[in-house]
C-alpha cells in the first residue's frame, strides 16, 4: 500500500499512541545511523510482520524511544532513495523497502521506512543471518520462529476446501476448459484400453 502524506501522518500518530509493537521501531537518528543496524532491523521487522500475518512493518527515524518527535538529519543531503538498492545487496530474495517516506511533523523531518513481510516459508536475512525483535532490541531469529516461517511452505491453499463456495464462484470459461480436458482425458483412456485389449498388452 502506498500512503499519502496525510494518511501516513495519521498512521504514525496511531503507532505512537499504541502500546509496544513488534512490527514498529522508532529511532531518533538525529544525524546518522548505522547501515548495518538498518539492515538488521529490516530483517527483524520483516520476519515479525510475516509471523503476525501483516502486510508491512515500520522503522521510523526522527522519533525518540519515548515517542517524542525530535526530527532527523539522516541523509538529508541526498541518497535516501538509493537505500533501496543498497539494502538489496545484503538481503535474501532481493527484498528491499516497499517505500521510503520523507515528511514533516511538528516542523520536524521524519523518515518512515515501509518494510515488507518475509516471503512465505523463507525468513528474511541480513548478510546471511535472520533476526527478530526482543523487547526494545533485536536478536537472532529463534528456532521456533524459524520453524514457524519455514512450515508455511508446506501449505497448499489450492487444496483447501472452501465450504461456502458454489459453482457461481467459479469462472465459466475455466469450467468449460476443465470439462473439455476431462472429456479428452477420458477418451484417451478408452482408446488406450481398447488398444491394449486388441494387442493383448
Model-based region annotation:
Residues 1-201:
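Conserved N-terminal catalytic/coupling substructures associated with nucleotide/phosphate chemistry
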Amino acid at each position: 500500500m502506498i500512503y499519502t502524506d496525510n494518511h501516513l501522518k495519521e498512521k504514525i500518530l496511531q503507532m505512537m499512541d499504541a502500546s509496544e509493537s513488534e512490527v514498529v521501531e522508532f529511532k531518533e537518528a538525529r544525524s546518522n545511523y548505522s547501515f548495518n543496524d538498518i539492515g538488521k532491523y529490516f530483517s527483524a521487522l520483516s520476519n515479525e510482520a510475516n509471523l503476525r500475518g501483516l502486510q508491512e512493518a515500520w522503522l521510523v527515524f526522527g522519533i525518540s524511544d519515548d515517542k517524542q518527535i525530535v526530527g532527523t538529519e539522516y541523509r538529508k543531503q541526498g541518497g535516501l532513495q538509493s537505500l533501496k538498492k543498497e539494502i538489496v545487496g545484503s538481503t535474501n530474495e532481493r527484498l528491499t523497502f516497499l517505500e521510503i517516506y520523507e515528511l514533516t511533523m511538528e516542523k520536524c523531518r521524519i523518515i518512515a521506512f515501509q518494510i515488507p513481510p518475509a516471503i512465505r516459508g523463507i525468513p528474511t536475512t541480513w548478510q546471511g543471518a535472520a533476526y527478530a525483535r526482543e523487547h526494545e532490541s533485536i536478536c537472532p531469529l529463534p528456532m521456533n520462529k524459524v520453524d514457524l516461517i519455514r512450515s508455511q511452505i508446506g501449505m497448499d491453499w489450492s487444496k483447501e476446501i472452501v465450504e461456502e463456495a458454489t459453482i457461481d464462484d467459479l469462472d465459466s470459461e475455466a469450467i468449460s476448459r476443465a470439462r473439455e480436458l476431462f472429456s479428452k482425458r477420458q477418451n484417451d483412456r478408452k482408446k488406450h484400453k481398447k488398444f491394449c485389449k486388441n494387442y493383448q498388452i
